Amino acid sequence: MQQYLDLLAHVMEKGSDRGDRTGTGTRSVFGYQMRFDLGEGFPVLTTKKLHLRSIVHELLWFLKGETNIRYLKENGVSIWDEWADENGDLGPVYGAQWRSWPAPDGGHIDQIANLVKGIVNNPNSRRHIVSAWNPAEVDQMALPPCHCLFQFYVADGKLSCQLYQRSADVFLGVPFNIASYALLTMMVAQVTGLKGGDFVHTLGDAHLYHNHFDQAKLQLTRRPKPLPFMRINPEVKDIFGFTFDDFELIGYEADASIKAPIAV
């Protein structure tokens, strides 16, 4: 994906060196946007191999509304381990906000169910929005949401999604986020009877950690390969009915993975 390599090069060449919460140091830019046409293939990096299993299981975990890493651990996914407490809990992170946002009357709002219903019943609405940024609960979260708000848009029988990501770890996080929200868009499109349109990724603080520079330079020497295609089980018509086996990535060829430390 040339769009991602362009982002990587832009941050390396134009970014400002700044301190950060982790003490690692970053080079960052503020405000950057990428667009991916889902009709051209599934936007997963080919200049380094990604662990698709982690991406799919994390998304299913979000959609379950869960905030304990037990499900992830049972399925061989360790990407949230560093932030969980001794019981595996993370506080009211993504799943809680997506599926169980606290309402003033003591009840809860299922933003995902409302989203799907809204797309079906009023596709032209400009209110197809899900937010994970809850100011009343952000201090209770092990890690405040980085990808914090997304909006869907219907036109010409296609469903597009725009994500706003306040904090974007360009080397480790962003490739996962692109694939995750592209997949979510395809899933929502299927259950609402639409085709996949564009995934638009808008970044706030887009940063490369200083200890990722060598890895970024290596990746920039590689050339993108043709995108694979994601096959989704067409029998699934409920957004909460998907399982891992409903997804098959066809034709994925990628260069070797590039290891890099996580800044916690």
Swiss-Prot record:
Say yes or no: keyword RNA-binding present: no
* Assigned EC number: 2.1.1.45
Q: What class of enzyme is it?
A: transferase
Q: Record's GO cellular component, any one?
A: cytosol
**BP-aspect Gene Ontology terms:** dTMP biosynthetic process; dTTP biosynthetic process; methylation
Q: Which pathway does the database say it acts in?
A: Pyrimidine metabolism; dTTP biosynthesis
What are the UniProt keywords, alphabetically?
Cytoplasm, Methyltransferase, Nucleotide biosynthesis, Transferase
Q: Do you know which InterPro entries this protein is assigned to?
A: Thymidate_synth/dCMP_Mease, Thymidate_synth/dCMP_Mease_dom, Thymidate_synth/dCMP_Mease_sf, Thymidylate_synthase, Thymidylate_synthase_AS
GO MF terms listed in the record are: thymidylate synthase activity
Catalytic center at which residues?
A: 146
One Pfam match, by short name? Thymidylat_synt
Q: Report the superkingdom from the record.
A: Bacteria
Reactions it catalyzes: dUMP + (6R)-5,10-methylene-5,6,7,8-tetrahydrofolate = 7,8-dihydrofolate + dTMP
Q: How does it assemble?
A: Homodimer.
What is the role of the protein in this entry?
Answer: Catalyzes the reductive methylation of 2'-deoxyuridine-5'-monophosphate (dUMP) to 2'-deoxythymidine-5'-monophosphate (dTMP) while utilizing 5,10-methylenetetrahydrofolate (mTHF) as the methyl donor and reductant in the reaction, yielding dihydrofolate (DHF) as a by-product. This enzymatic reaction provides an intracellular de novo source of dTMP, an essential precursor for DNA biosynthesis.
What is this protein's record name?
Thymidylate synthase
Q: What is the scientific name of the source organism?
A: Rhizobium etli (strain ATCC 51251 / DSM 11541 / JCM 21823 / NBRC 15573 / CFN 42)
Kindly list the organism's lineage.
Bacteria, Pseudomonadati, Pseudomonadota, Alphaproteobacteria, Hyphomicrobiales
- Gene designation per UniProt: thyA
